[in-house]
Amino acid sequence: MRMKAMRMKALLIGSAAALLAAGAAAQDITGTILIKKRLTRPSVTAPVSVYQRGTAVKLGADAEQDPIAYERSRVVVYLEAAEGPISAGAAVPDAGAKAEPAEQVEQLDRRFVPDLVVIPVGSSVSFPNMDPIFHNIYSLSKPKTFDLGSYDKGETRKVSFPKPGIVEVYCHLHPNMAATVLVTPNRWYARPDRMGHYRIPNVPPGKYTVVAWHKSAGFYRKSIVIEEGHDQSVDFLIPIDVDPTQDAQANQNPNEAGGSH
């Protein structure tokens, strides 16, 4: 029994040492998302809406001061692993890492706020109703199908997402409401800043595909090899000849998307 315990302890120590070594050798992936002009069709809501309970609420129009920065905000960059610790599901230890806060999508003024959230597989999203009316949130997407039923102001319902992919979320009662939950296959993802710069830190050595997804333009992929001691820079040019009405075709499951750009 004592010998078995000693072997188990040695195995645990060896596993921890391997993960720490991977963390020490981890590199950064950085890059820039280049977008030349607006790709998304502006959506404008009516200036005044009367809720079903008779409460008049003023709704603001989508007025973007910086259309290109707005387009960059609709981009997510993440990794798909071919070989290496990420493909095996290993987590690289980070002494300074903090627990990620739960994502939340509010139902506010008959809109989803925000209308795009990114979570790693296995995480959840809360959907609080902030409006003085009922909402009924649902999705028919392959990675996650759900229907939360009707619920009133002040109530919150949560959905977990066990599979990676694109999940389009709608409201049965308000057809204009739409949001997207992008579920990444791991925790190595980033969203660019207003200038289009992104950074994915602590990537272990291995072979990967860097995926850039734009909510209207779809998926773009580049293969890279991360070697110890060498960071990588990967830029993406999002085409300008995209029909913004084709969101449904662009927003397919990344595991089912046909062809790389």
Residue ranges and their predicted role:
Residues 1-15:
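Bacterial N-terminal signal peptides that target proteins for export
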